[in-house]
Amino acid sequence: MLLIPSFTANSNEPPPSKLSLSDLSMAILKSHFFLLFPLLLLHFHTVSFAQTLFVFGDGLYDAGNKQFLSQNRVDASFPPYGVTVGQATGRWSDGSIVPDYLAKFMGIPKISPILLTTADFSHGANFAIADATVLGSPPETMTLSQQVKKFSENKNKWTNQTRSEAIYLIYIGSDDYLSYAKSNPSPSDTQKQAFVDQVITTIKAEIKVVYGSGGRKFAFQNLAPLGCLPAVKQASGNVQECVKLPSEMAALHNKKLLQLLVELSRELNGFQYSFYDFFSSIQNRVIKSKTYTFETGNAACCGTGSINGSNCSAKNVCAKPEEYIFFDGKHLTQEANLQVGHLMWGADPEVIGPNNIRELMVLPLDITVILAGIQEAMAAMRPRQSNIESLYDIKKMESEMDNHWLYQVDKAISFMI
């Protein structure tokens, strides 16, 4: 069963809303309804609800892979991790993580870690693992390339159609930039850009590998303001302010990542995506914690030091994790993960675009073919197309797309199904 969650009270992000067409878009759609409707009906047979979720990333999405790969003690396999749900499961939180909630909203079971060989993978697999990076070869983890390779090795567990209809959820890069900032405290603008380009180029290559295996629907959660993580602030010695360089690197990454997704949507036939502004969501909650139901956005629930930025253990955990954004120095509480899950699932374009995941999962696989035909037939009548060149100006991007009538047809299709 498909679940439609409600939003957490007091959130400034808009809740899911029904389709709102601009006057111009509505006029065009009405006047050309008889031209468009047969085309839409002709292709409705390709529409189906995604029932499979593949997850790639780092500790924010790790459902337990670290405990199967590491030769050392994995903290997430022991209390106080899992304290809110009664047991530690290898998740770096007091309870559920974002992929768990998205699976729930999709109406499927939680997605198991791929290294749990006895698991049921009929609805997908989770390849994410703590400490994962895009670049390099860190020990006891899997880089993005290694995660994608593991997916390729196991892809025959799923049919071609299943892989093409699935959602591919990705969050990775934090550890790359945290390591870079630690090793390069004063890089030039050119050096910063060069490193970001390396990361983005690798992500592009791995997206294309997944695309080559049938992947079409990609959901990206952009990077958090890394300098605001309790672990990073505490290590800097100034716990009252976010550290500039890690957050700056994350913002540069997010800009380039959005540009990449726009580029791929033009280059790869059938490529569809969601881009969630996680950076702003966390930044807003750190600055205005109480607005989002949290008591503090500065300190972690579990750990040692002035803001609990390190060494989370059962001896130093808070009584009410739900009052905190961060459970440990780098990872979110279940409550924060729930809010993020809601936003990714059903928020408006100011938060996630051009589709939220609820819309992405029902988009026809050949929607680009439909829209391309309509676009060609009515090119002279449409408003200007959006020209997304500024990477991290999501509100500008979505404002322009909201005036693009083809974008409205896209939305109309998903809501008519």
From Swiss-Prot:
Biological process terms in GO annotation: endoplasmic reticulum organization; intracellular protein transport; protein exit from endoplasmic reticulum
Knockout mutant characteristics: Defects in endoplasmic reticulum (ER) protein export and organizational defects in the ER, including aggregation of ER around the nucleus. Increased sensitivity to salt.
Cell location: Vacuole; Endoplasmic reticulum
Cross-referenced CDD domains: SGNH_plant_lipase_like
A GO cellular component entry from the record: vacuole
Tissue: Expressed throughout the seedling, rosette leaves, roots, inflorescence and imbibed seed, but not in pollen.
Gene3D superfamilies, per database record: SGNH hydrolase
Signal peptide (UniProt feature, chain positions): 1-50
Record keywords: Endoplasmic reticulum, Glycoprotein, Signal, Vacuole
Keyword Glycoprotein: yes
GO molecular function annotations of the record: hydrolase activity, acting on ester bonds
Residues modified by glycosylation: 160, 308, 311
Induction profile: Up-regulated by methyl jasmonate and upon pathogen infection.
Keyword Signal: yes
Active-site feature positions: 331
Coiled-coil regions, chain positions: none
Family annotation (InterPro entries): GDSL, GLIP1-5/GLL25, SGNH_hydro_sf, SGNH_plant_lipase-like
Oligomer and partners: Interacts with the PYK10 complex and TGG2, but not with TGG1 or PEN2.
Biological function: Involved in organization of the endomembrane system and is required for endoplasmic reticulum morphology and organelle distribution. May act by inhibiting the formation of PYK10 complex by binding to GLL23 and exporting it from the ER. Required for proper subcellular localization of myrosinase TGG2. Has no lipase or esterase activity.
Family (UniProt): Belongs to the 'GDSL' lipolytic enzyme family.
Protein name: Inactive GDSL esterase/lipase-like protein 25
Gene: MVP1
